[in-house]
Amino acid sequence: MANALIEDLKWRGLIYQQTDEEGIEELLNKEQVTLYCGADPTADSLHIGHLLPFLTLRRFQEHGHRPIVLIGGGTGMIGDPSGKSEERVLQTESQVEANVKGLSNQMHRLFEFGSDKGAKLVNNKDWLGQISLISFLRDYGKHVGVNYMLGKDSIQTRLEHGISYTEFTYTILQAIDFGYLNRELNCKIQVGGSDQWGNITSGIELMRRMYGQTEAYGLTIPLVTKSDGKKFGKSESGAVWLDPEKTSPYEFYQFWINQSDEDVIKFLKYFTFLEKEEINRLEQSKNEAPHLREAQKALAENVTKFIHGEAALKDAIRISKALFSGDLKSLSAKELKEGFKDVPQVTLSTKTTNIVEALIETGIASSKRQAREDVNNGAIYINGERQQSVDYELSSKDLIEDEITIIRRGKKKYFMVNYQS
């Protein structure tokens, strides 16, 4: 019998591979299932490239199943070779511990913890750290054939350039994770990105060999791709992080609202919990009135609210509207710095100067003649307000919180003016 959750995941395009499609559907239909997804603490924050497997795990929770969120405090000391063309640089134990703390805090935004049926947060260092070298080789290594491991894509792709024994053993450690969670918490499904297929199947095979366990399954999520061929999860400024100190909620919101018409419906299915009917309505709106960008607004609002909360979403929308309308004086210096993060930074030696002199000193104008022409032609805006007098004097009233001034030349060329103290 078809399972409603699996049907929804298929409609959203969220299933890439399943170890046993019929077995998974039968299991989900007969009981509340415990399943898990993990992340190694390679940084102290997740970025949006990590989101999809965990959002998929959250969908299982929404349907009454119990998710286990695993932070790899143990495996993070080793490094997963999957999807990597060269050896990872090993982190110190203190780095890994700090990163574990950061990721653990973020998971509380993604899942409901606490109740008997709530999500459970675990750190695989708690059990991997207890295994001795002799036990690893005798109790686990004995059940994993070298030829079997060499057949894994994550290993094969690295053999030409070399792989250390450290990373070679990674798949066994992740296999031990699945076996431990299966025995201790009755965990029967592992969810992961498409690059985790080899690690997931290793866990299932290890359980079969060691315990005769056959009721263990794997499900992978597709790699997120963009229609233009560019890598998903990157903005012009770099990775889009979940940590608001690394990527502000405004920048986060802007990333989503700027998605193309070609990608927006797919991303609504992937990254939001909107119902099928609403997404279909937004698709119709996108097709009939693309200029309204209703689908992009829904995507940005839903994902930003889920990750950062209602208040941060309202601030992001307010900043966006102010920047679009040119009402710059309604924003704080911090908000302006977020909004104009990527514009040229220029410096003035004094907070009081003639507008023409200011344009020359900052390099916005190449000569006094050009500066005068720009001002007279109405091409110069100070904090969103047009200034057409060459006699205008910049003063303290043109400073936002006594820190910065935003000068615009023409329709779109912005400059952030800082002042020498």
UniProtKB/Swiss-Prot annotation:
The keyword ATP-binding applies. A motif ('KMSKS' region) lies at residues 231-235. It comes from the Bacteria. It is found in: Cytoplasm. Its EC number is 6.1.1.1. GO terms for cellular component: cytosol. L-tyrosine binds at Y36, Y170, Q174. GO terms for molecular function: ATP binding; RNA binding; tyrosine-tRNA ligase activity. It holds the Pfam family tRNA-synt_1b. ATP binds at K234. One of its GO terms (biological process) is tyrosyl-tRNA aminoacylation. The keyword Protein biosynthesis applies. Keywords: Aminoacyl-tRNA synthetase, ATP-binding, Cytoplasm, Ligase, Nucleotide-binding, Protein biosynthesis, RNA-binding. It catalyses: tRNA(Tyr) + L-tyrosine + ATP = L-tyrosyl-tRNA(Tyr) + AMP + diphosphate + H(+). Homodimer. Catalyzes the attachment of tyrosine to tRNA(Tyr) in a two-step reaction: tyrosine is first activated by ATP to form Tyr-AMP and then transferred to the acceptor end of tRNA(Tyr). Belongs to the class-I aminoacyl-tRNA synthetase family. TyrS type 1 subfamily. This is Tyrosine--tRNA ligase. The gene is tyrS.
